[in-house]
């Protein structure tokens, strides 16, 4: 972004090429800024022969000096993997004051964009829909600061079911005996025994000592203990879901480092997104761009030289 380009005239001859290379090398030797020799036209046979004779590569060809995204400053927020929990994503966005963050696949390509509004919208939906689909146990343990109690739980990768917050009067609740339920309880032996008897997929025990018979339990229930209270667990369990389930995907407007700012402005005027992902030549995410970055962009700086 801070490079200064040095070039001769169009349709350069040997003098123009050599002058650009010499001046760029001189300024780089002085060490004040980074200078790059370029050419804005095809190189002729005489110049190529001369460069080959002395072992020099011709300067890079630049077709136009129009400003590109690679020439300006843009945001470089941390990229989050698809499997990261919403709880961690929310904390990163809050601490870094980031409005929107890119979600990337394992190979670094874009999966989607996640905003604070996406997390809030999902959180509101969980009030009316307590179902959880394919929640990674690793995420759940991390968010709840929990530990696996029984050996069977270490073989479980994901859990699926309806979240049930067991109160004393919940003992007769039909959901408590559903194998697909995820039961949250405290130091309630009757509830624990009923849940294990029903074979619920997951039992989360809050702020209670774990009995030895639970450690040795080898049934089809993943048992987790946590130092958090049941109210917090009931909220955080939904925040353990991977961000890939709530991030915006599909028709995302992306820009590449080589895109020209004039073209970028036109596309931005036709849409109302807060920010846009910036990709490199391999479609890897390198940052985000917003309208703010286009207000006073830095232009390419050029030095024109000749003999």
Predicted regions and their residues:
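Bateman/CBS regulatory modules and CBS-like beta-alpha motifs in cytosolic regions of diverse proteins
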Residues: 5, 62-92, 104, 110, ...
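N-terminal beta-loop-helix "entrance" segment that forms/cooperates
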Residues: 28, 32-57
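Short N-terminal binding/cap micro-motifs at the start of the first secondary-structure element
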Residues: 12-18, 46
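Short hydrophobic alpha-helical runs that function as membrane-insertion/retention elements
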Residues: 36, 60-61, 101-102, 182-185, ...
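Long, charge-dense
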Residues: 130, 215-248
């Amino acid at each position: 972004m801070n490079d200064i380009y040095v070039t001769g005239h169009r349709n350069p001859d040997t003098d123009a090429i050599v002058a650009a290379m010499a001046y760029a090398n001189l300024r780089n030797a002085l060490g004040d800024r980074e200078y790059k020799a370029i050419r804005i036209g095809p190189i002729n046979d005489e110049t190529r022969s001369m460069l080959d004779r002395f072992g020099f590569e011709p300067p890079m060809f630049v077709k136009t000096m129009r400003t590109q995204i690679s020439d300006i400053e843009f945001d470089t927020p941390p990229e989050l993997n698809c499997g990261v929990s919403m709880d961690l994503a929310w904390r990163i966005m809050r601490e870094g004051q980031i409005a929107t963050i890119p979600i990337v696949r394992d190979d670094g390509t874009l999966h989607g964009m996640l905003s604070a509004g996406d997390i809030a919208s999902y959180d509101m939906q969980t009030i009316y829909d307590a179902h959880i689909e394919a929640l990674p146990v690793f995420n759940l343990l991390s968010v709840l600061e929990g530990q696996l109690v029984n050996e069977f739980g270490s073989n479980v990768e994901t859990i699926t079911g309806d979240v049930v917050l067991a109160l004393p009067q919940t003992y007769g609740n039909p959901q408590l005996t559903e194998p697909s339920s995820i039961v949250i309880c405290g130091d309630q032996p009757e509830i624990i025994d009923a849940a294990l008897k029903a074979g619920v997929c997951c039992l989360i025990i809050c702020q209670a000592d774990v009995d030895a018979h639970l450690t040795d339990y080898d049934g089809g229930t993943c048992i987790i203990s946590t130092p958090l209270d049941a109210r917090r667990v009931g909220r955080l369990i939904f925040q353990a879901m991977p961000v890939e389930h709530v991030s915006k995907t599909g028709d995302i407007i992306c820009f590449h480092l080589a895109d020209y700012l004039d073209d970028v402005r036109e596309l931005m005027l036709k849409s109302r997104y807060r920010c846009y992902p910036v990709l490199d030549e391999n479609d890897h995410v390198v940052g985000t761009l917003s309208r703010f970055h286009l207000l006073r962009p830095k232009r390419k700086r050029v030095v024109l030289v000749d003999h």
